[in-house]
From Swiss-Prot:
Upper lineage: Eukaryota, Metazoa, Chordata, Craniata, Vertebrata
GO biological process, one term: MAPK cascade
Protein name in the entry: Serine/threonine-protein kinase SBK2
Domain of life: Eukaryota
Entries under InterPro entries matching the protein: Kinase-like_dom_sf, Prot_kinase_dom, Protein_kinase_ATP_BS, Ser/Thr_kinase_AS
Signal peptide: none
Keyword Transmembrane helix recorded: no
Length: 348
């Protein structure tokens, strides 16, 4: 990716509610309980999965065809079952870099979410070999979204609409289960066909239950929500919310529409492009519209300014995308897909 060219109520009731949320690091009690329930369900699944791990060397069971992807923590291979010939994707995590608990966690999160059509289907087979842990998923053979983004151009508008609808549906599904995805970026969106009609989320190693306390571990990137860059409300960190995913989705959609990031870091004092965006966000005046946004239509402006609101409690939820699917998102393109057709492909 190139650079940033690269019923109102009594006042007392509201005050009490704000005080309660402040004591919970910005979460309501209901939100906190939802995350705790998700965490307990994952712990139960991990306990069961640990008891059913297949202990064998991968090459005894599967034949490697070719690599599908490589990351910091492991690799993904296209394999076939030696007896049945079934093609599968195998994610292999080396033991020196992955604990058993870390492996079981990612494996079980994927299992719990794979029923959605825009999320990679994980199969209930975990393998422990001498030097690695592995699990199997459906194979998606056309690479990730990054390879399809043309620098300074992005994707064709119909493909952006389809991608937005499907990713929003997948994220809504994740959030409804008390989880926050936390790693939305082109590299984690797999493309199912050369025409970019179907997309699937993958890689759930960073997914966490809502309310998990999180501190920023490294320098911020464009997808990092600004609340993660601020001092956390609790000593242990920021309780994570679905608003983190809404922010990342807004940044991703900007990239798909323009072919570059809206900014490098969401820090006004360090990034003039982000500072310009904040000025426009506050004023709403056309004269304050930053140059990188000039090619976008009014519907895209409204959508992205909602998803990229710097205040997480005011930020639009990912489902806001549905309101804008039937409109043009670029000024230079007049085509707009019918909302029903796009939503049908969202896999809801």
């Amino acid at each position: 990716m190139p650079g940033k060219q690269s019923e109102e109520g009594p006042a007392e009731a509201g005050a009490s509610e704000d005080s309660e949320e402040e004591g919970l690091g910005g979460l309501t009690l209901e939100e906190l309980q939802q995350g705790q329930e998700a965490a307990r369900a994952l712990e139960d699944m991990m306990t069961l999965s640990a008891q059913t791990l297949v202990r064998a060397e991968v090459d005894e069971l599967y034949e490697e065809v070719r690599p599908l992807g490589q990351g910091c923590y492991g690799r993904v291979l296209l394999v076939t079952h030696r007896q049945k010939g079934t093609p599968l994707a195998l994610k292999q995590l080396p033991k020196p870099r992955t604990s058993l608990r870390g492996f079981l966690y990612e494996f079980c999160v994927g299992l719990s979410l794979g029923a959605h059509s825009a999320i990679v289907t994980a199969y209930g087979i975990g393998i422990e070999s001498a030097h690695s842990y592995s699990f199997l998923t459906e194979p998606v053979l056309h690479g990730d979204l990054m390879a399809f983004i043309q620098p300074k151009v992005g994707l064709p508008q119909p493909a952006v609409h389809r991608c937005a609808a499907q990713l929003a549906s997948a994220l809504e599904y994740i959030h409804a289960r008390g989880l926050v995805y936390r790693d939305l970026k082109p590299e984690n969106v797999l493309v199912c066909d050369p025409a970019c009609r179907r997309f699937k989320l993958t890689d759930f190693g960073h997914t966490r239950p809502r309310g998990t306390l999180l501190r920023l571990a490294g320098p911020p990137i464009p997808y990092t929500a600004p609340e993660l860059c601020a001092p956390p409300p609790l000593p242990e960190g920021l309780p994570i919310q679905p608003a983190l995913d809404a922010w990342a989705l807004g940044v991703l959609l900007f990239c798909l529409l323009t072919g570059y990031f809206p900014w490098d870091r969401p820090l006004a004092e360090a990034d003039p492009f982000y500072e310009d965006f904040l000025i426009w966000q506050a004023s709403g005046q056309p004269r304050d519209r930053p140059q990188p946004w000039f090619g976008l239509a009014a519907a895209a402006d409204a959508l992205l300014r909602g998803l990229l609101d710097p205040h997480p409690r005011r930020r639009s939820a990912v489902i806001a995308i549905r309101e804008h699917l039937g409109r043009p998102w670029r000024q230079r393109e007049g085509e707009a897909e019918a909302v029903g057709a796009v939503e049908e492909e969202a896999g809801q």
